[in-house]
Regions:
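Conserved acetyl-CoA-binding loop-helix of GNAT-fold acetyltransferases
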Residues: 96-112, 135-139
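Glycine-rich phosphate/pyrophosphate-binding loop shared by adenosine-nucleotide-utilizing enzymes
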Residues: 5, 64-68, 163
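Acetyl-CoA-dependent GNAT
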Residues: 37-93, 105, 110, 114, ...
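A short beta-loop-alpha structural element at the N-terminal edge
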Residues: 6-18
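Conserved catalytic-core motifs of GNAT/GCN5-like acyltransferases
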Residues: 70, 122-124, 138, 142-162, ...
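Conserved GNAT-fold acetyl-CoA-binding loop/helix
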Residues: 19-46
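Short, cationic low-complexity segments
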Residues: 182-194
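Conserved GNAT acetyl-CoA-binding A-motif
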Residues: 111-133
Length: 194
C-alpha cells in the first residue's frame, strides 16, 4: 500500500477529513488522553497554529487523507527550539501498511532541514494491554529508531482505567557549541516540495 501513498503539507481545509481520522482515537482508545472530540473550528485552529512554525503532514491515497503527523514545541522556552514533540494518527483501515513510516520519514526530513536535533514522542502505555490501548505505538517508534527515555506511572485516567505514559526520543542532528538558528517550517517547505 505504501507505493500508492503520497505525502503533502496539510492545509486548514483538511480539518474535517483529519478530524474524522482523529475522532475514533478519542472516542474508542486511550492512545490519546483527550476525552472529547474537538470541534471542527478548534481542530482547524490547531492545524493553522502548528503550520506557522512546524510541519503538519498528510498522507493521501487517491486524494483521500488516510493519516497525518505533525510536530510541535516540546516546551515553550527558547532553549527548547531544537526539540519537538511528534504526534501521528493513521486511519484504522490503513494501519500497518507503511503510512506511518512515510509520514515520519517526511517529518524527519522537514525537521532536519529546520535544524531540529531531538525528536520526542509521548505515548500512552498500558501495564496490561486491553481493548483501549496496546503497546503497538511503542513498537512502531522503536522500529523508527526511538528509544524509551522515561515514564510516568498511571498518570492518565480514561475509560475507568489508569494508564502510564512513556517518553521516547530520537536524535537526528548534531548538538553544536554554536547551534545555527532553528528555521521555521514556512521558510523551508518550498525547498522540500511541500
Amino acid at each position: 500500500m505504501s507505493d500508492s501513498v503520497s505525502i503533502r503539507a496539510a492545509v486548514p481545509e483538511d480539518a474535517a477529513a483529519l478530524l474524522a481520522i482523529y475522532a475514533p482515537y478519542v472516542e474508542h482508545t486511550a492512545i490519546t488522553f483527550e476525552y472529547d472530540v474537538p470541534s471542527l473550528s478548534e481542530f482547524r485552529g490547531r492545524i493553522e497554529k502548528t503550520l506557522t512554525r512546524y510541519p503538519y503532514l498528510v498522507a493521501e491515497i487517491d486524494g483521500k487523507p488516510v493519516g497525518y503527523a505533525y510536530a510541535g514545541p516540546l516546551k515553550d522556552r527558547r532553549a527548547y527550539d531544537y526539540c519537538v514533540e511528534l504526534s501521528i494518527y493513521v486511519d484504522e483501515t490503513c494501519r500497518k501498511h507503511g503510512v506511518g513510516r512515510l509520514l515520519y520519514d517526511g517529518l524527519e526530513n522537514c525537521l532536519g532541514e529546520m535544524g531540529i536535533t531531538n525528536l520526542y514522542a509521548c505515548i500512552g502505555y498500558p501495564d496490561i494491554e486491553d481493548e483501549y490501548l496496546t503497546k503497538n505505538s511503542v513498537g512502531f517508534h522503536e522500529h523508527m529508531g526511538y528509544e524509551i527515555i522515561g515514564s510516568f506511572r498511571k498518570c492518565g485516567y480514561k475509560f475507568k482505567r489508569s494508564y502510564s505514559m512513556v517518553w521516547m526520543e530520537k536524535i537526528i542532528g548534531d548538538h553544536l557549541e554554536d547551534q545555527p538558528a532553528m528555521r521555521p517550517f514556512p521558510e523551508v517547505r518550498g525547498m522540500l516540495g511541500y
